[in-house]
Amino acid sequence: MWKNIVIVLLYIFFRLYHLQNSFFFFNDWGRDMLVLLKWQQGGLPPLLGPLTSALPFNQSAVYFYLLYPGFLLFHGHPVSSVFTCLLFYLLGFYFIKKVFKLNSPLLIIIFLFSIHPQLIIQNRFVWNPSFLPPLLLISIFSFYFLVKNYSSTHLFIFSSSITLAISLSYSAAPLLISFFIYWLLFSRKFIKRYLLSLFSGFLLFNLPTLVFEIRHSFFLTKQLLYQSPANQFNNNLISRLSSIISNLFSTNNPGINWFIFILFIVIAFYFIWHQRFNRGLPFYFSFLFLTTLIISLLLPITFHYQYIFPLLCLLVLVISSFPRFPKIILILFLSFIYLRPSVFQSYFKTPQRTYAQMDQCTKSFCQSFKEPIFVSTQASFHTFHNGPEHRYLLRKNGCQVKDIETDNGQADFMLVVEDGSRLTPDINFYELDLFGKYQEYKYYPCTPQFNLRLIEKVNDPPTSN
C-alpha cells in the first residue's frame, strides 16, 4: 500500500510543485481559455474543438467540455486545466487498477509516467493531446482482454476509450490501426459488434461537430476534401525515425536514445518470437509497439512531440513486462537520466513573465482604457503575433477586445503586447497589415520583459477632386 501512495505522491509532485510561479501561459493554452471564457460570457457551448495542425479539420469539442467545470471552479484561472488533467490521470489509473486488476504493472506505469520529461511538460502545459495517455492505456488493456475473452463490458470500455482518445487528438489513430491489424491476425471475430461500437463512440463524441456541419452546410468536410493540408511530410526515413526516438526517450543524448531504441526493438522481437503461440501481455505490447512505430513512420506528416503518446504508452507497457532484473536496471537508468538536477530544475523555473504579472498589467490597462481594441503581440521567444493568451486576459479583465480578422473596422486602436521584445518601425506582420497605418498613442510599462504599446489607426486624408 505504501508503494502506491509514494508513487502517486511523486506523480502529483511533478505536476503541481511551484506551479503558481512556473507555469507558462502561452499560445494554445490562451486559445483554449478564450473559448471557455466566450462560453461563460455567451452561455452557449462551443461545437468545435481545437483545429489540428496536420489537417484542415477540428478535434471534438468534448475537450472543452472536460475543461469547463475546472474553469468555473477556479474562476477562469488557467491553472485549472492542470488540475483537471491531473484528476483525469488519477481517475484513469484508479479505473485500470479496479477493472483490470493489474497492480504491479500499474505501479511501474505511474512511476515512469511521473518522471518522463514529455509527460511532465505536457501535464504542466495542458492542451488537447495531454489527456490521451490514460485513455490509451485503458484501450490497450481492454482490447487485450476483449480478444482473449469477448465481453460486452470490455467492448464498451475499449470503444469508448479509443474513440474518445482519437476525438481529442487524431494522433491516437495509429493505435486503432494497430488494434485492427492485431484483430485481423489473431481473432477475426465479432466484426459487426466492433464496428457498431466504434461507430457509436465516434458519433457520440463528435456529435457537436456533426451539429456544426449540418448548420454550416458541411463546411469542414468541404474544407477537408478541397483544401490542401499543410505540407508537413518529411520523406527522409532516418530523420523521421530520429525525431520519434528523440521524443520517445527524451534523454537529450542521441547516442543513448538510439542505444535504448535498438535494445527495445531486439526485446520486442524476442517477446514476439518467444510468445508466438500463447500470445501473453509481453507479446501483445511488443506487437502493438512495433506496428504503431511502423505506421507512424509511414504516415505523411512530420512527427512532432505531441504525437508521441501512443508509442510512449506502449513503450512503458513493454518495460512493465520485462523480466524482473532487466526491468529494475532499465528503470534505475531512466530515473538517473530523467532526474538529473539540470533536467529536474527545468520544470520549475520561473518564466520571463508570470501569469500574475500578465494579469496585473492587463487589468491595469483595462481599468484605464475603455475603447474597443484589437490585440497583437511582438515576442522574443516565438513568431506568432495573434496573442490568444493576451486576448484572453484583456477580455477577462473587462476590455472590449475585437478580432482583427472578423471585426476589422470596429476599432481604431490596437494594443501590441511586447513580450520580451519591442515594436519598432521596421517590424511588420499580418495583424499590423490588416490594421493599416498607425501612430503610437500611449505606452504602458509593466515589467522589464512585459509591456503594452497602444497604437492608433491613421486614416489617409480625403483627396480633393
Placement of each model-derived feature along the sequence:
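Extracytosolic helix-loop segments that constitute the early lumenal/periplasmic catalytic or substrate-binding loops
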Residues: 14-18, 30-58, 62-65, 69
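Loop-to-helix entry region of an early transmembrane alpha helix in multi-pass inner-membrane enzymes
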Residues: 61-65, 73-91, 122-126, 256-260, ...
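Hydrophobic/aromatic-rich transmembrane helices and adjacent perimembrane loops
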Residues: 123, 282-325
